[in-house]
Amino acid sequence: DYLSGDKGNGDKFKAFDPLYGTHHKFYGSMDYFYANLFVDGYAPGLMDSRIGVRFRASDKVDMEMNYHYFTTAVKLPDLKRSLGSEVDYQINWSVMKDVKLSAGYSFMRGTKTMDVVKGGNHRSWQDWGWVSLNINPRVFFTKW
C-alpha cells in the first residue's frame, strides 16, 4: 500500500490521508498508522510492503501471519526512510455455529526515523496480544 507524502518544504500540502480509511486492516494490527498519522508537522506518507501466509489447519481452525515493512513515501531531510517492521499472528477457531474464538499477537520494531515522525522510543519492545469471542446469532430471518 502507498499513501503519498509531503516533504514539508513547499507552499502546498501534498500528503494523502484516506478519510475514514480502514487502516487496521491494511497497515498492521498494532495500529501505529491508524488515526493521527504523524507528529510535529511531519506528513511523509506511508509505504507498507506486506507479505503474509494463511493456513487452514482443519475445518474449524485457521491461522494467519503477516510481516509489514514500513517506510516513508518521501525522503525527509536528515532521516532515513525506514520506519520499522511489524509481525502479526492470528488464530481463529470456529467453536460452533455462530461462535468463533480468535487470538492474536503482534510486535513492532521501530527505527530512529519512527521516533522523530511518530514519537516514542524505538529501543523499547512494542507488542500486544488479544483474545476475542465473537457470537453472531441469526436473530431475524425471512424468505421472500
Task: Enumerate the language-model features and the residues they cover.
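Extracellular/periplasmic loop regions
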Residues: 1-54, 116
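Outer-envelope beta-barrel architecture signal
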Residues: 47-49, 55, 59-61, 97-99, ...
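Residues on the lipid-exposed face of transmembrane beta-strands in outer-membrane beta-barrel proteins
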Residues: 51-55, 89-93, 131-135
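Outer-membrane beta-barrel translocator domains and adjoining extracellular loop/strand segments
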Residues: 9-17, 74-82, 113-120
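Residues that define the transmembrane beta-barrel architecture of outer-membrane proteins
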Residues: 45-49, 81-87, 125-129
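Transmembrane beta-barrel strands of outer-membrane/channel proteins
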Residues: 2-4, 65-69, 103-107, 135
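Outer-membrane beta-barrel "beta-signal"
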Residues: 123-144
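Repeated loop/turn-to-beta-strand initiation elements of outer-membrane beta-barrel proteins
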Residues: 59-65, 93, 97-103, 139-144
